[in-house]
Amino acid sequence: IAVDSRKDTDALAKVAEHATRPLTIDLQENYRLAEVVAPWVAKLRYNPGHLYHHERDRPIRDKVAYLAETAATNDCAIRIGVNCGSVDPDKLEQFPADDSISPMLASALEHCELLDDLGFERYCVSLKDSDPNKVIEANQRFAAQRPDVPLHLGVTEAGMPPDGIIKT
């Protein structure tokens, strides 16, 4: 469930009251909503590329520490959700413009290291692109470096049927 505003959190509370299965939320661009929604869900998803949108002067490590502490306090897991369309700007600058996979990989690995350093172990990673071949390559490269981290597989912006169904 995507959550990006207080209105969304109010709706989530109503959905959670009737849910018969654990819920996962996608914090979209507002990571500060984590503490509001965490009591209702089993997993928090954040996008490392979106952590730059709020409190730009606050270090990324502090933002990840807030998410890890919130998740731990509420018995939630975390998904580090790296998306080809919103990669951390600093990572994009480190690689050639025609290499879209390496910045995603660098971002995912950095955030795994941040959570590891914080002692938070209940996390998985997703590396998504609209091109299924890039998704496969990104996940294979990630798994070669971090075989200990579970992967959440999928494409982003899959599209409408039939192409969207085939990609997914």
Task: Label the model's feature ranges.
Residues L33, H53-I60, P161-G164:
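Short, charged, surface-exposed secondary-structure boundary motifs
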Residues V3-W40:
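N-terminal active-site wall of soluble small-molecule enzyme domains
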Residues W40-R56, G154-V155:
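Glycine-rich phosphate-binding active-site loops on the catalytic face of alpha/beta enzymes
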Residues N83, L92-T168:
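Catalytic alpha/beta core domains of metabolic enzymes, predominantly
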Residues I1, R21-L27, L44-Y46, C76-V82, ...:
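Hydrophobic faces of well-ordered beta-strands that scaffold small-molecule active sites
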Residues H18-R21, A38-L44, A72-T73, F142-L151:
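Glycine-enriched alpha-helix->loop->beta-strand junction motifs that scaffold or abut catalytic
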Residues P48-G119:
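Conserved anion-binding
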Residues T9-A16, A34, V64-A68, L105-E113, ...:
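Generic structural signal for well-ordered alpha-helices
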